[in-house]
Structure formats: structure tokens, C-alpha cells
Amino acid sequence: ELDESVKVSYEHESQLASKPDFFGIGAEHFLELALREGEWVIRRDWYLDPLDVDAGSVSSGTALSSPFEIDVPYLPEILTATADSGDDKEYAYLYNRENAVAYADKYCGLAWGCGNNRKYNPLYENFTGLGGDCTNFVSQVLGDKEAGNLPMTYTWRYVPNGAGAGATRAWAQASSLLSYLLSSGRAERLARGTYSDLIAPSETYPGGAIGALNAGDLIAYEKNGRIEHFAVVIGADSGLYLLVNSHTADRYHVPWDLGWDCDTVFWLLKIVI
């Protein structure tokens, strides 16, 4: 394995005289080496391009599994419910946005700028090799006691060890988390549309729907009718452009639409509790 961490600087065209903004990206490479004429050379390199999330797996050999969906066999049989059972309605709580953002910065992984020595939180399984860790990371941001501190439920929880250890579908799968958040009332869909749709002024959102998100809110990414990715909103850059953190690939303070094409459908989700 080989870890890659990159710092990227950029400037807005309207602010070329100002100081540049920075974001970080990271990638984990799985290398196959071959000994040729007494020297080790790279024969194959499997990785996810952190600047082109929409491309999926990039490889010179056999592709990795889909980077965005965890296959059912990796999840405990007893924890596969996806519909909200109402078991979280009894709680009185508030989402801690400040801690959620701090957690997202601390545990965003290999990208430049991430904390914790650029390591994931060791208390949670890393699903990168099993299909992708983006949704697991967002669930941590929402529910870890160090982060947003939303109480786990039967439908949405992570069990670190013992009977039933593992993640529920709603915790680890993008489409299931989206369904859970909306059905449970923990999130509200502000808008769903392409980039052009979300930056266009409307009566409800004069500055565009994208401007209605705050730090700690979420964006889900849909391609061909399938929810493929999740990211957490961190804030905005000097040009007030929304920034996100994510896993698979690891991103720190990256512009929210970078790497996604004009056909991508974005779901803007506001955490409302």
C-alpha cells in the first residue's frame, strides 16, 4: 500500500489579487510489484482518483468493487432494516454542528489538512476495501459523541464489537442513509437538482439553494438514479463557495461539486434536529 496526500491552491477569477484558498486530497494506492532485472517495479496500481470522484475506480488492472455502496453480505443479518421504526422520536437532543465539523476535519483521512496524523478514527471499521467509506464517515460525523452526537437507533447505528457487531445499512450505505434521514425527520431535503439548478436564484432561495446549507449539513450525490456518494459541508472559502469533506476519496475543504459532471444530481440535506 502507498498513501498519497496533496495540497492544492486555487483562486477565484473575481479575486485574483487576493490570497489563494487551499484544499487537500488523499488517495490510498494498492500496488502490485514485480521483480525485473533485479529491481522492483510497479506492475499495477489500484486507486480512486480524489480529483475525479465521478470516475469510480481507476485501475490498470482489475477494478476494485464499486466505491460507493457496501454489499449486503458485509452487514450483520439482524441489522438490515432501512425504514424508520420511530425509535428515535423519544429523544430530546440537538445536533452539535461545531463538533461535527471539527470531527470531520480531524478524521477526514489521507488528505492534506486532515488531523489525527491523517488516520481514520480507529474505533470504526474502514469500508474502503469493501465498497467505500463515504457514508460510514458521514454517519460518524452525525452520531459520534465527539461529533454531532445524534443518538443511534436500531435502524441507524454502529456496533463496534460483540453480538451484532458492524454497521446497519442505514449507517454504511448511501441510499439507505438518505432514506433514513428523510423518513426519520432528522434531515430535510432543501433541493434536488443539477449544478445549474442549485445555483439558480429562485423565490425561495434568491441566492440559489446551495447557499442555504450550513456547516454540518450534507450533500448526497446521485448518478443515473443511484445515490453514489455523501459529503459533509464544512463551510465556505474566501469566495463564499461551499466546501465539503469526505472519505473515498479523502477530501479536506474541497469545493462541493469538484469532480462531478453536469449530469450529476445533488441532494441538499439540512439536519433539522
Show the residue positions of the predicted features.
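Extracytoplasmic/periplasmic, Sec-exported soluble proteins
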Residues: 21, 25, 92-96, 126-134, ...
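...with weaker cross-activation on analogous glycine-rich loops/strands in unrelated enzymes
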Residues: 163-243
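N-terminal capping segments
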Residues: 76-172
